[in-house]
């Protein structure tokens, strides 16, 4: 193991110990952590699709309803829709609902709401790529 990796792992262990000492975390702290993770998930998910909103702009759009100058309506809707899809998935998990093909299509429809009515909730029929990646998603053949 190289020295840089060892230092990072030691730092992670130290931070984990500090976090463990604070347990159980207060409910409001847990909610803040979850909210931050949800925004980061929305930001990263949209970023790989070519959305140019920054992490901070994504938070403003989702949490405050702010319109960002110079950004397209599509980019705003992608952030809002992704956030709403996360909430929907959490609701499904809380209710212990079985995930079905219909559920997956409903999530997809939420993601594309107001963006691509023709394809919302449907399987894609054309190949896609991830911006800046050599990884190829499953193709629709």
Regions found by a protein language model. Name each.
Residues 1-141:
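FIC/Doc superfamily catalytic core
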């Amino acid at each position: 193991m190289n020295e840089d990796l060892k230092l990072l792992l030691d730092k992670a262990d130290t931070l984990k110990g500090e976090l463990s000492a604070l347990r159980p975390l207060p409910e409001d702290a847990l909610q803040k952590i979850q909210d931050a993770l949800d925004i980061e998930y929305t930001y990263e998910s949209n970023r790989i699709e070519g959305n140019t909103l920054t992490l901070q702009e994504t938070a403003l759009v989702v949490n405050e309803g702010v319109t960002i100058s110079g950004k397209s309506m599509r980019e705003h809707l992608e952030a809002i829709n992704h956030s709403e899809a996360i909430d929907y998935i959490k609701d499904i998990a809380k209710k212990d609902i079985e995930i079905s093909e219909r559920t997956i299509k409903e999530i997809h429809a939420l993601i594309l709401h107001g963006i691509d009515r023709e394809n919302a909730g449907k399987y894609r029929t054309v190949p896609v790529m991830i911006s800046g990646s050599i990884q190829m998603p499953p193709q629709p053949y």
